[in-house]
Amino acid sequence: MKRSMYAGRVREEHIGTTITLKGWVSRRRDLGGLIFIDLRDREGVMQLVINPEEVSSDVMATAERLRSEYVIEVEGFVEARQQANDKLATGMVELKVSALTILNTAKTTPFEIKDDVEVSDDTRLRYRYLDLRRPEMLENFKLRAKVTHSIRNYLDDLEFIDVETPMLTKSTPEGARDYLVPSRVSQGHFYALPQSPQITKQLLMNAGFDRYYQIVKCFRDEDLRGDRQPEFTQVDLETSFLSEQEIQDIVEGMIAKVMKETKEIDVTLPFPRMSYDVAMNSYGSDKPDTRFEMLLQDLTVTVNGIDFKVFSEAPAVKAIVVKGNADRYSRKDIDKLTEFAKQFGAKGLAWVKVTDGQLAGPVAKFLIAIETELSSQLKLAENDLVLFVADTLEVANNTLGALRNRIAKDLDMIDQSQFNFLWVVDWPMFEWSEEEGRYMSAHHPFTLPTPESAHELEGDLAKVRAIAYDIVLNGYELGGGSLRINQKEMQERMFKALGFTADEANDQFGFLLEAMDYGFPPHGGLAIGLDRFVMLLAGKGNIREVIAFPKNNKASDPMTQAPSLVSENQLEELSLQIESHD
């Protein structure tokens, strides 16, 4: 029989009609001779009633065989429920079954198919096809589909061209580790799965496409966390002849459309702008969460000269004030915060509390001479807790920024209903890598430096600024972009600044440099992490909740057992040998 509609869409207007439904048995109950079935499909749950006095003995026998997650087909008459269930969209109606067919049986599931089920993450991933049956998960993917639909419509209306770029590309340095794919035809050579379509989308601008977009899979072999996966999806944009502001206007319009169509929220445009330096110095992060205060305070000058060498001899002394919550933190709690601070390079964590109008705590005696000035600068009040970090400016900022976020979550200071977007601009072009012992690109080596700082490519790289911009949402980097280099001479200078010899630059990026000989237009773009965006819209804490078949924290798939061993024949075809490291 043909299905009449989704079970979750049956409403009062269907009362008096005969319909056919198909789906899964969510629950079966036997009450007073009647059998009640909760039938679940993609759109929700519908109650079925099987009355032995109104159906054949075959139907009754079939109904008695039903168990959870059996797949069934039913025909029946829609009636009003005697006792409505206002927790269900279908709660005003029920289906009196006249015909019933079992389409497939099911074993007992390893966990109950319902929201808020207590089960390990690996078990959820091992049986992901069951996990995805849960209504909460289905809603996540409906939201994701609405987001991508909204984005495509918006960009199509602005005459962006959707172009697919290669999945098998060339491995290049300056980024995360590549996933490599050995070539059977060119033995000893490898493709790389793209970390982004960065260079190919730039080449599309050289081809005259003017406006490109793609919702594209990307791959990075990096350590995983809650908002990262080895394969992820980004909304990738590139434009020709547009300014930084014009590109940002397009992106803001796209996000405003998504927010309106998926959350019914009118966001205020334009988004606030904050320089990288302000973000780091005031929030301790290049992706600041602006939903709460607790800004970092610079006390380096204030404490200069006091009789406490930890402060007076430190390159920087900064603090955050936890307003009105000192009594929430015992010595043991502060010790835990100290251990947390050490993860970010801090040697320790100094602290004082405001108790009975005076500073109290391990370092209070060293602050007596500046207590009035300190209290005024920090606007201290009774029951405030002050946390200090004395170290390099970088360590102080990073440590207090992390503490700020942790404490705000611990004290439930964040309004979870808010969506605070902002642009972080005026980025440094390079960042120092202790591991590499050299400067590396803060974004990528194709970013255009500001005209005022470009001369420092041959001087102090720390002074080079980039025409780059990140879009931030609630403390997460939603995406990043920049204007790109389109002049060959500037691109060669950039490669040289990064330590490439001319031969190395030509070997890795010769095709791009050659393209710059043929009228490369000014261009720029941006990429937004789609998984992360949907995660935040759905109010989830991990992007696994919005990716259909994600990997676990070991970059493995417990369901398919990927990655897996391959046969010796496959390795021989590729001229590969596996060395044991036992």
Swiss-Prot record:
GO terms for molecular function: aspartate-tRNA ligase activity; ATP binding; catalytic activity, acting on a protein; nucleic acid binding; transferase activity. One of its GO terms (cellular component) is cytoplasm. It is found in: Cytoplasm. L-aspartate binds at residues 174, 220, 443, 484. GO terms for biological process: aspartyl-tRNA aminoacylation. Its main location: cytoplasm. SUPFAM superfamilies: Class II aaRS and biotin synthetases (SSF55681), GAD domain-like (SSF55261), Nucleic acid-binding proteins (SSF50249). It catalyses: tRNA(Asp) + L-aspartate + ATP = L-aspartyl-tRNA(Asp) + AMP + diphosphate. Keywords: Aminoacyl-tRNA synthetase, ATP-binding, Cytoplasm, Ligase, Nucleotide-binding, Protein biosynthesis. Coiled coil: none annotated. Gene3D superfamilies: Bira Bifunctional Protein, Domain 2, GAD-like domain, Nucleic acid-binding proteins. ATP binds at residues 220-222, 229, 477, 529-532. InterPro entries: Aa-tRNA-synt_II, aa-tRNA-synth_II, aa-tRNA-synth_II/BPL/LPL, Asp-tRNA-ligase_1, Asp-tRNA-ligase_1_N, Asp/Asn-tRNA-synth_IIb, AspRS_core, GAD-like_sf. Residues 198-201 are annotated as: Aspartate. The keyword Nucleotide-binding applies. Its EC number is 6.1.1.12. It holds the Pfam family GAD. Belongs to the class-II aminoacyl-tRNA synthetase family. Type 1 subfamily. Catalyzes the attachment of L-aspartate to tRNA(Asp) in a two-step reaction: L-aspartate is first activated by ATP to form Asp-AMP and then transferred to the acceptor end of tRNA(Asp). Homodimer. This is Aspartate--tRNA ligase.
